[in-house]
């Protein structure tokens, strides 16, 4: 029975929560612009889906009794082509899926291995069979039309199979018409256009139309019997008339929910959404010190794809239209020229500028600058005169602590030090807060048309045409009278080869004789008419294999005896021992070229299968090109100077020694010899402050002091004005072509189609193998008399099936698959050049 209608498809589970986006890392110092990064490698293609399970084949209907053979009539003239039946109503088409973008014509990939056959599903309810329609007469074959361009559509939506009709009675067989004269071949047409048809042969005489046999009664459903013995080939009868189309069968009950089918073709990405409004500007954050560029974070995983809406109801199946007679396929037209590249479309509108992001946390402090060069050492001053040692005074009490003076003026900014080398990458910063989802953007304008695809590969050579039918057997000639022996004359011309004689018993091989002189080549005889085919003989018992005889000498040609009756072919005996190689025989006349057989008719396309569920989402797209690097903002204003540190406390006062005893005044001594200058004594206790001396001259420049400690970080400065737009980056290189997707899994088998009309009889079979050589005749005179023509051989066995016809036309385009997932996040590109300060 017909297969049940496929049940509704189950809903897809809801999409999971998308992961929180990573927080923004600290801003690094902008390095020099690097070359644009290469496009990332394509992602691995997804695994093909599991093939669907095959449904259970419905029970086979009961076979009707064979009708009574009609009276054999003569072949009738070709009837008028019957009117085409009313086409059935077409089922409602479901909502179209997104159209897939057409790719370039790729080379034909290898056919993948067939998937495993799934377990059988429950059988569907059989529909009510419709009445048997009469077969219409075959119309005259029209001229071949020009071959249309080869379409490249997607797989069509399979239709629901209609009910299977009850086979009607076998029509009466008509007599075979006389073979028409083969027409002259038409002149060769221009390339791509069909050649003109040759003149049609004269039609055979009109025969009586065979009477239609009674309809067979529908038998009860029984087990399938063993195959019967193949009968002899019947004579084709006259074509019947087309019957009235039966009513549509009752709609079968909905079957269970079908198993998910194989993966569908990857759909093209959806249109870009409308750009969301500009987000609210957040509060101004504390600007951090320019940090170093952190390492690139791992690529985020693509979010889950949304689940599609519920599938619409399936339309009622349309009525099956009557099958029209297919015309002879025309010659294939020449391929058209490659189309020109389409004009480039206008650029899309510029998107709204996004809002300013939140300020990231402060980065680590920068490295300490390199100290400046040391100053030159000044000249050593002249030593001053030694002062008079003062008396020890009593130290005064410590004065009150002075007030803190006002802060000094900020020093002028020193010259910028050399640019330090790039430090190691800092640790990745914490992930930023999750941003609000933007509104779907408006669809962008269409991009420029792609260039023309590469010309497809040349198609494979077509199947060789079927072998033409064998001509009719001519009338058997009369037996000639036996002539008298004449005088021995010169060797005569070689006569035409006589018909093959019956296969005799295998004799013993004689010894090879000396080769005789080669006679002159005779003129080939005229081809005789083939006689009618005789009845098939019965197989005789197998003969025992004889022992190979000794190699005898070649004897003279004997008198040809009368041809015996054709014996029935016995079964093949066991293989004998191969005999010695015989001498090469004379070449036979060239064979006559056979007539080309009639072109077979293209069968009707089978019913469309049930639409499979949409395939899984496509693989992730390849990484996008590196975008232009924006310029950096201006440097913020410097912070206020740091506070001056407090003055340290004075150390403890030393202990004052006791005054010494005053000695007796000595006498005036005689000045002695000046001694050598002694070592400088220890520094005495500071005396009271002396009077302010005169101002000294300008001293030499002092030596540069050691670099002071870094001051504390100043307060954050205000945000600088937004910088000007940077120079657009270089246009990225064109990405590499993606790898071809995986070969799709084999689809689930469609429902059993309705039984088509009976095909044409096959071509006559190849001639049987050459019979074995008969025994050598008795030695006769040199010139033998003309032999009696042998009886015509039997017909060969049934020929092998003809070659496969051309493939049918492609079905209509199927619905596109669901939109693919978003591609993986690309790796950050190299840092661009620093922007120009305004």
From Swiss-Prot:
Location relative to the cell: Secreted; Secreted, Extracellular space; Secreted, Extracellular space, Extracellular matrix
Region feature Disordered, mapped onto this chain: 1-838
Tissue spec. comment: Forms the fibrils of tendon, ligaments and bones. In bones, the fibrils are mineralized with calcium hydroxyapatite.
Biased composition (Gly residues): 351-360, 447-456, 582-591, 633-642, 693-702
Signal sequence bounds: none
Post-translational note: Prolines at the third position of the tripeptide repeating unit (G-X-Y) are hydroxylated in some or all of the chains.
Compositional bias segments (type: Basic and acidic residues): 39-53
Segments passing through the bilayer: none
Keywords, comma-separated and alphabetical: Calcium, Collagen, Extracellular matrix, Hydroxylation, Repeat, Secreted
Compositional bias of kind Low complexity: 11-38, 101-122, 137-147, 215-236, 329-344, 407-424, 436-446, 479-523, 530-550, 568-581, 593-602, 649-689, 703-718, 736-758, 766-781
GO cellular component entries: collagen trimer; extracellular matrix; extracellular space
Pfam families tied to this protein: Collagen
Family from the record: Belongs to the fibrillar collagen family.
Subunit relationships: Trimers of one alpha 2(I) and two alpha 1(I) chains. Interacts (via C-terminus) with TMEM131 (via PapD-L domain); the interaction is direct and is involved in assembly and TRAPPIII ER-to-Golgi transport complex-dependent secretion of collagen.
Function: Type I collagen is a member of group I collagen (fibrillar forming collagen).
Protein's name in the database: Collagen alpha-2(I) chain
